[in-house]
């Protein structure tokens, strides 16, 4: 439980040298002058060589949550791993009725997972794949903040780490997560002044676009939109940039009209004002709102203190301008765009868009904070908040690990290769789904009959009617997860894992019968 506290103390030591100030510095060069004097690749090589020990140490620290439990508890991750196992069975000819498709997007993490599994096995591949995803997201955000401010955001690393382990990570949306991280790297290269005149650097940024698309299309949309906005904004005097924000808002509104007229759309259930970037830190319960509030207080005080201290410094506010404008536009998108978009007659939707967008908002807040002159109290305050956040996260993921161990014990009581359904509902105050712990524990033991990926028609594992391993109707899968799926004779034999008393973490297993609802005996507080 105290691992993360020691890690934060180490982070404090790493950041003391040559980055801490306690009094206003002499007037800085303008951000435009600094950008014009910088070439990305040589500057990056010099930076990495100079700070390689620090970079390695910080990388090791931010990966601690990937290794502090037996399993990484991150929503859809269990489903990703389970379907990687199904892919192995299909390749070996052991899963008739299932096939492997080759979608062009939303698949990069799955390819990474399967490729590593062939070398290291599934469980080790899971750790390596998630660790790589975290490093891509964290250092991508770090690079983007550096590009926006021409200053390495060492003192913001606790905040970046919290965002890296925020809602998007805990939901297990790793294809989207990697797409964002790669897009941050590309945008850092394309930031005005950093790659001007260097065709090689432009080529690197452009070459990332296909890789980002294979990860998730939203990453490409964000990258192109942000790069275009930044390029135009850099050519417009600051006093006119408010009109550019208005134009961007109009484009978002037109996109909303297009989506609503051509697709089936849904709105977010929660009030939209809650999705302000801080929601990325609200995970398994209301106590995370303490972390959100502390971060909000820090942001207000830190920016106010910086503005007051630098009020006589000509043009200091320009470093704030474009990151703040991008944040405002991202929040306009949160308010205007639908939460879910589905093609008519297609079973699965691109869902939770509102919540996903706040990952961008959170990183853009970090970019805004990067414009401040760094002061040692920034690191002290953020390290303290991060200690609270990661303590909560350790405790909650430890609880889910214990639930998963209970699932493992339950499925071991079954004959091999049985169909298993599960209805495990999260508490109302939690924003993170947990039902996919059953998927992971079925690997090599049973078949998670209600896993949503084969029936969705958008992932690489596809189920054909009459197969023994997976449901084929997406609506049936949704009903099963809610516990009101009526069992058919052809679904049997099958077993239900369910919450069996008022303690939502206590699980039981039982055989199912034809014509009964799968979660008939479930108890949900």
Residues covered by each model-derived region:
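Transmembrane-helix signature of polytopic, membrane-embedded enzymes
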Residues: 9, 48, 57, 141-164
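Short hydrophobic/aromatic helix or loop-helix immediately within or flanking a transmembrane segment
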Residues: 82-86, 99-122
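Membrane-interface transmembrane helices that cradle and orient dolichyl/undecaprenyl
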Residues: 186-201
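Signature aromatic-anchored transmembrane alpha helix within multi-pass, membrane-resident enzymes
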Residues: 370-394
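Transmembrane catalytic cores of multi-pass membrane glycosyltransferases
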Residues: 67-80, 93, 101, 105-106, ...
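Short periplasmic/luminal acceptor-recognition loop of GT-C membrane glycosyltransferases, typified by
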Residues: 400, 410-504
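Transmembrane-helix motifs of polytopic, lipid-linked glycan transferases
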Residues: 128-148
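Short acidic/glycine- and proline-prone juxtamembrane loop motifs at membrane-interface regions
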Residues: 171-178
């Amino acid at each position: 439980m105290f691992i993360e506290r020691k890690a934060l103390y180490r982070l404090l030591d790493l950041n003391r040298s040559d980055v801490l100030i306690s009094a206003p510095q002499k007037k800085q060069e303008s951000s435009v002058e600094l950008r014009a004097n910088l070439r990305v690749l040589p500057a990056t090589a010099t930076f990495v060589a100079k700070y390689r020990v620090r970079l390695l140490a910080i990388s090791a620290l931010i990966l601690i949550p990937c290794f502090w439990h037996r399993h990484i508890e991150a929503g859809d991750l269990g489903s990703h791993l389970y379907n990687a196992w199904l892919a192995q069975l299909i390749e070996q000819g052991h899963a008739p009725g299932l096939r492997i498709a080759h979608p062009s997007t939303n698949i990069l993490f799955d390819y990474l997972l399967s490729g590593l599994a062939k070398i290291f096995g599934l469980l080790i591949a899971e750790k390596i794949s998630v660790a790589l995803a975290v490093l891509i997201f964290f250092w991508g955000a770090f690079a983007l903040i550096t590009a926006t401010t021409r200053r390495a955001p060492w003192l913001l690393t606790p905040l970046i780490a919290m965002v890296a382990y925020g809602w998007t990570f805990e939901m297990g949306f790793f294809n989207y997560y990697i797409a964002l991280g790669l897009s941050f790297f590309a945008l850092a290269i394309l930031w005005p002044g950093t790659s001007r005149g260097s065709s090689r650097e432009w080529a690197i940024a452009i070459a990332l676009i296909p890789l980002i698309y294979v990860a998730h299309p939203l990453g490409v949309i964000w990258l192109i939109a942000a790069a275009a906005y930044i390029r135009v904004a850099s050519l417009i005097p600051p006093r006119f940039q408010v009109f550019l924000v208005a134009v961007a808002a109009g484009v978002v509104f037109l996109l909303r009209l297009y989506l609503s007229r051509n697709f089936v759309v849904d709105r977010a259930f929660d009030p939209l004002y809650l999705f302000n970037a801080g929601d990325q830190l609200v995970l398994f319960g209301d106590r995370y709102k303490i972390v959100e509030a502390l971060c909000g207080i820090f942001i207000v005080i830190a920016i106010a203190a910086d503005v007051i201290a630098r009020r006589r410094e000509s043009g200091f506010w320009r470093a704030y301008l474009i990151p703040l404008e991008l944040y405002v536009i991202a929040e306009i998108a949160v308010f205007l765009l639908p939460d879910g978009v589905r093609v008519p007659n297609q079973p699965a939707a691109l869902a939770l868009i509102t919540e996903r967008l706040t990952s961008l908002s959170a990183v853009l807040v970090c970019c805004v904070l990067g414009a401040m002159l760094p002061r040692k109290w920034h690191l002290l305050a953020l390290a303290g908040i991060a200690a609270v956040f990661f303590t909560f996260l350790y405790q909650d993921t430890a609880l889910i690990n214990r639930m998963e161990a209970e699932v493992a014990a339950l499925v071991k009581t079954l004959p091999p290769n049985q169909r298993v359904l599960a209805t495990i509902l999260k508490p109302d105050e939690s924003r993170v789904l947990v039902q996919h712990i059953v998927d992971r524990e079925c690997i090599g033991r049973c078949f998670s009959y209600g896993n949503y990926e084969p029936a969705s028609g958008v992932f690489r594992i596809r189920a054909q009617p009459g197969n023994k391993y997976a449901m084929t109707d997406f609506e049936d899968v949704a009903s099963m997860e809610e516990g009101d799926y009526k069992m058919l004779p052809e679904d049997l034999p099958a077993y239900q894992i369910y919450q069996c008393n008022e303690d939502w973490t206590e699980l039981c297993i039982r055989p199912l019968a034809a014509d009964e609802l799968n979660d008939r005996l479930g108890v949900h507080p």
